Amino acid sequence: APDAEHIIIAMGSVCDTIAETVDYLNAKGEKVGFLQVHLYRPFSLAHFAAALPETVKVLTVLDRTKEPGALGEPLYGDVCSALIETGRTTKVLAGRYGLSSKDVTPAQIIAVFDNMKGAQKNHFTVGIIDDISNSSIEVGAEPDLADASTVSCKFWGLGSDGTVGANKNSIKIIGDHTDKYAQAYFEYDTKKSGGITRSHLRFGDKPIRSSYLVTKNANFVACHNQSYMEKYDIVSEIKPGGTFLLNCTWTPEELDHHLSAEVKRTIANNNIHFYTIDAIKIGKEIGLGNKTNAILQSAFFKLANIIPVDDAVTYMKAAI
């Protein structure tokens, strides 16, 4: 906002998330802003001074680094020096983000703005809980900032079961054969083969600025391994009215027994569309053996309704 009173200054991987959150907050009537550093060296004092509105009351500088023993991180030091050079006495807070490759989400950016308006804790961390020196700030509930056209999906798979490869193929099909923007992130644990994998897909009619994993408000979630239902909280990630696909060998009676009361309650209270598929049985019947990735990929295209399922199958065959 041109009359912003609280501004975050940052560079690097956090910028899209900050911009997305600032637009969301300003649409609600708040006076917040974001100053992105595109070229760090040489640091342009003239451009910095011109970009900073006179209305600003508090600044927070976010660095993705930790320099023990220093008075502050590099960008924070430069901003403080720049303010002195220009004769301004605006209060400046320092924060660290992304340590240990932690995701930075809109809720964390909102927490940074709340800190400026409230306690004004300095030299804080966000996105990681610091229970040693207690430098972290409190983070609230995660808002849904996605554009109405954006579809968020998450797939829980088993290492080497083909889930990640199928999703890479899916996002390529959507990106190549539709006008939609596409984004994909993939998580693996240390086991690789036999370990847990998580695939995070987004696509929509507008550029996607959500540079963080899908952990809440997903339109579509698929669990490709039935044992995960007893180990992980999967259905809470689905938004009301979303779709949940479970690959399992359970009969309806066994399904009722294996799903916890909490899972059933979440599905019912949020009107989640719940589907099951026995991809292993189908694979054996059609000669694919234990290879379930193509079957589950087809189920995704059928349920997600992004492109005609017949076209999707054609593109899948072409990719093999």
Map each language-model feature to its residues.
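Flexible inter-domain linker/hinge segments
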Residues: 100-152
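Flexible, glycine/charged-enriched surface loops at secondary-structure junctions
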Residues: 1, 32-33, 88-93, 119-129, ...
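Active-site cofactor/cluster-binding pocket
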Residues: 42-46, 58, 62-73, 149-159, ...
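Extended, charge-rich low-complexity interaction segments
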Residues: 61-80, 116-133, 216, 304
